[in-house]
Amino acid sequence: MRDHTDEKSEAAGNDDGHVRIGGLPAFDPDDPAENAVINRLVGNWHRRAAVKREEPDVYALFDPGRPDFREDMIPFRGHPIWERLSDETRSRLLSWGWVAYNRNTVLIEQRIANPAFELVIGGAYPGLGGQQLELAVAQAMVDEQYHTLMHINGSAVTRRMRRSDFSDRVLPDSHITTIHQEHLDRCEEPWQRSLTTLGFATVAEISINAYLDLLADDQEIQVVNSTTVKLHNRDEYCHASISGEMMKQVYEALPADRRRFLLEKVVAGLEAFVAPDFTTWESIVAFEGVPGWEKAAAEVREAQGGTHLVQDHSGIHTLLTEMDVLDQVEFGWGTTVTR
């Protein structure tokens, strides 16, 4: 957990060579792509940073010949309908994939992670409290706002450079935020709502690295896209440790029935987090007017139902093992390897 009690210099270096300015994500001052993303995030960054030299902006880094997203992350990719698409339509679907990925990330931050942090600061959970925790959680909330802006910027770059709207209004709420809301709607007591959000947020904050890893180190997609995700990813390793400790402390302070309830919500959150978002992709191909999409969508759902887009479940597996409750939950861990 970061120590936020000491005064920080405006630009501070880390042992790994990354620089953190204020609340911005840590970045490599020698990496042009990372500098460009940070520069986009805060317009006057180059006047404040320790390294003051001209760096390319995000638009200069854009390569029209590179895909915006990973083709193998599109559910329709393995269906014959994909082979019948024109190169132009495939390219548009890959751009949509990046925009939808960003929107899902933003919705997770705004509707699940930050609401849980707000509940912590508001004293909703037993076993939690104290200045150090409040400072760490408040800083995490600031981080999440930067992450939100980074991903909104990421979509904005794609829209400008591809000269197309790719409007978020075309997209439904993401799968995990929809499932989270469904669980909230079934709650009858305030404690149920707060524990539901904690369960889903714990999954999101601990498993988000696995989701971001899907693009962070990809060498084929747009450099600015993978770099945006990479910068976000670094902060989330810290958030994972904070969320894991909060989960342990709250669980220990709960009576048996509420412990069971919380574990049920962790499993529900994990199932929603790792699943492919069929509804979003159906909305995309419908909007794009892909011929035969309805039949293809039904076949894809049947073939891929129960599969996991995010294959790495090790974060939650490790947490539940440390809590000595792994045998109390039912989840298809597959070949999960603990870290």
UniProtKB/Swiss-Prot annotation:
<feature type="binding site">
    <location>
        <position position="144"/>
    </location>
    <ligand>
        <name>Fe cation 2</name>
    </ligand>
</feature>
<dbReference type="InterPro" id="IPR025859">
    <property type="entry name" value="AurF/CmlI"/>
</dbReference>
<dbReference type="InterPro" id="IPR012348">
    <property type="entry name" value="RNR-like"/>
</dbReference>
<comment type="function">
    <text>Involved in chloramphenicol biosynthesis. Catalyzes the six-electron oxidation of an aryl-amine precursor of chloramphenicol (NH2-CAM) to yield the aryl-nitro group of chloramphenicol (CAM). During catalysis, upon exposure of the diferrous cluster to O(2), ClmI forms an exceptionally long-lived peroxo intermediate (CmlI-peroxo), which reacts with NH2-CAM to form CAM.</text>
</comment>
<feature type="binding site">
    <location>
        <position position="205"/>
    </location>
    <ligand>
        <name>Fe cation 2</name>
    </ligand>
</feature>
<dbReference type="Pfam" id="PF11583">
    <property type="entry name" value="AurF"/>
</dbReference>
<keyword id="KW-0560">Oxidoreductase</keyword>
<feature type="region of interest" description="Disordered">
    <location>
        <begin position="1"/>
        <end position="22"/>
    </location>
</feature>
<dbReference type="GO" id="GO:0017000">
    <property type="term" value="P:antibiotic biosynthetic process"/>
</dbReference>
<feature type="binding site">
    <location>
        <position position="147"/>
    </location>
    <ligand>
        <name>Fe cation 1</name>
    </ligand>
</feature>
<comment type="pathway">
    <text>Antibiotic biosynthesis.</text>
</comment>
<feature type="compositionally biased region" description="Basic and acidic residues">
    <location>
        <begin position="1"/>
        <end position="19"/>
    </location>
</feature>
<dbReference type="GO" id="GO:0046872">
    <property type="term" value="F:metal ion binding"/>
</dbReference>
<keyword id="KW-0479">Metal-binding</keyword>
<comment type="similarity">
    <text>Belongs to the AurF N-oxygenase family.</text>
</comment>
<keyword id="KW-0045">Antibiotic biosynthesis</keyword>
<feature type="binding site">
    <location>
        <position position="236"/>
    </location>
    <ligand>
        <name>Fe cation 2</name>
    </ligand>
</feature>
<protein>
    <recommendedName>
        <fullName>Alpha-N-dichloroacetyl-p-aminophenylserinol N-oxygenase</fullName>
        <ecNumber>1.14.99.67</ecNumber>
    </recommendedName>
</protein>
<keyword id="KW-0408">Iron</keyword>
<feature type="binding site">
    <location>
        <position position="236"/>
    </location>
    <ligand>
        <name>Fe cation 1</name>
    </ligand>
</feature>
<feature type="binding site">
    <location>
        <position position="239"/>
    </location>
    <ligand>
        <name>Fe cation 2</name>
    </ligand>
</feature>
<dbReference type="GO" id="GO:0016491">
    <property type="term" value="F:oxidoreductase activity"/>
</dbReference>
<feature type="binding site">
    <location>
        <position position="109"/>
    </location>
    <ligand>
        <name>Fe cation 1</name>
    </ligand>
</feature>
<feature type="binding site">
    <location>
        <position position="232"/>
    </location>
    <ligand>
        <name>Fe cation 1</name>
    </ligand>
</feature>
<feature type="binding site">
    <location>
        <position position="144"/>
    </location>
    <ligand>
        <name>Fe cation 1</name>
    </ligand>
</feature>
